C-alpha cells in the first residue's frame, strides 16, 4: 500500500482547475443550514479512490499536522467517500485557510482557483506512517504530478 496520497483543494471541470462556489474550499456556501465561514472538505477524486481504495480507514480517525501541533478528527464522507471532512467541519478548513494566508469573513465569501494558486499551494499530502495520518500543504501542480506516476 502507498504510504501517502496527494489530494487537490480544487475540482476540475472540462480540464480546468476550479473552486466551485458551494463545495470543497467553498463548502460554507452550500445550502441546507447556516455554516461556519471555514467549513470545507477536501475532494477525493475517483482516480484516487480507485487507485488507493484502502488508504483511509472506514471510521473516523485522527489527522495530525506534520509538526504535530494540531490534530483533527476526520473521516471520509459523501457518496462513494469522495470527501475528507473534519468534525467539526470548520476545524480542518480553518487550518487550511490559515496555512494558505487566506481569509473568509463571511460564509458567502468565495475562494477561486486564482486565489488558491497565488498562495503557491493547491493540494495536500496525506501520509500514513505506522497507522498515523499526517497532513501537509503541497505546491501547485503536486496533485497532477502524483496521478501521472
Please tell me what each predicted stretch does:
Residues 2-134:
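Polyanion-binding interface signature
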Residues 137-139:
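Charge-dense, extended regions
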Amino acid at each position: 500500500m502507498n504510504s501517502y496520497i496527494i489530494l487537490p483543494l480544487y475540482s476540475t471541470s472540462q480540464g480546468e482547475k476550479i473552486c466551485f462556489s458551494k463545495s470543497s474550499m467553498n463548502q460554507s456556501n452550500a445550502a441546507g443550514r447556516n455554516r461556519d465561514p471555514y467549513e470545507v472538505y477536501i475532494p477525493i477524486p475517483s482516480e484516487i479512490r480507485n487507485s488507493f481504495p484502502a488508504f483511509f480507514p472506514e471510521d473516523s480517525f485522527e489527522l495530525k499536522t506534520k509538526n504535530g501541533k494540531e490534530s483533527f478528527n476526520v473521516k471520509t464522507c459523501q457518496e462513494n467517500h469522495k470527501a475528507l471532512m473534519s468534525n467539526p467541519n470548520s476545524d480542518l478548513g480553518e487550518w487550511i485557510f490559515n496555512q494558505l494566508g487566506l481569509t473568509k469573513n463571511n460564509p458567502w465569501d468565495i475562494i477561486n482557483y486564482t486565489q488558491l494558486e497565488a498562495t503557491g499551494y493547491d493540494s495536500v499530502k496525506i501520509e500514513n506512517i505506522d497507522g498515523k495520518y499526517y497532513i501537509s500543504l503541497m505546491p501547485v501542480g503536486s496533485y497532477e504530478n502524483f496521478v501521472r506516476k
